[in-house]
């Protein structure tokens, strides 16, 4: 019973914040313009500030774990390849690009940081998980949506240039890079700067979760039910079953294991829908997968955490 209570305490507050976002939109406190701006604020300001504070204030030499970062990178890359092969039977009826992106791309930054902080009181190894996944997420999302788009057979130079520029200027990646440099050089942070950054950083989790909930829409599920269900099962179950045993075998525990779980088995991020639409896909499969995985992950993540707690790994 104690293990179940631990799991519920870890997951319910996170999803309640998302539910609050949905409620606030429903009653008119959040409108579409505000939700868009809130998402942008979290992505451009609050989350980079959180990552900078977390990494910059740590001893990077002690915190860095090459094996863990490579594990996160490798598991993500293999997830993308598996998603591609599983998508082949559905390619006549749905966008392969949407299927692959929705199957592998998690809400790693927002939900990952929220879960680790909620359980351990700090952000622990979630930052290292983000280093191993977010750059690859962004690169491969553009590649699969471009190459696996109906009528598209190759990546153009302009598209690749735009992708590289997007990665270099990604605020989350910039926050990580500046934090790493700050930590490596052991630069002292003035009290005023530290408190200002901290105040911005604490906004990332609650605002990010509420923005995700507010952006959530019940659409797209009635079409393409079978591929949506397959995609969702892969996202919430299959990748966890395939790759978590390797994480345990490699000796990862506590915040590293929780961050890996979020990377593998959390809901498909809402930004997948935005990106799919912006690259010429209809977005229906993505919207349906976001809806189903968001609802399902409230139960699946609780279950996985319960299993890990019973094994005394978290």
Regions found by a protein language model. Name each.
Residues 1-314:
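Alpha-helical transmembrane segments of multi-pass small-molecule/ion transporters
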